[in-house]
């Protein structure tokens, strides 16, 4: 018995297949999945290629912190790198709340910020001072005497004399973000 589909069944496996796409994305990490979703939203025929599993590369080792440029401002000046990241925390939070360019409502927010601290060494104090001035709108300095009780207990030793900073940079569960984007 034959049918019209026999030619497909009998086709050699190594036969070339023509595939026409507008955008080819290589890498199935968070950046690749984000780009895939945005390109598809814009109406592009898009294909994503991943040699292993989604999130198997660098994404697997990520801490999930959505940086807003704080770590790049530790030199005491705003750089192109720090400025290009300035809006990322807000952008991700908006997506997590269901009001952004992508739907990340199924992702898991682990923390709305994280902590940095400086010691009493001269270089640490200078770095902390300049970073706090440059990043004034993106982090809040926490005076160790007045705000110490609001810190996690590990950061409350009586003999600590440094300064705490709380960059407003959220942390997400990386694997839940991958699931939300996939």
For each feature predicted by the language model, list its residue ranges.
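Helix-loop-beta segment of a Rossmann-like dinucleotide-binding subdomain
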Residues: 147-180
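Beta1/beta-strand and adjacent pyrophosphate-binding region of the FAD-binding site
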Residues: 15-31
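N-terminal Rossmann-like dinucleotide/flavin-binding domain of flavoprotein oxidoreductases
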Residues: 81-82, 178-182
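Glycine-rich FAD pyrophosphate-binding loop
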Residues: 40-61
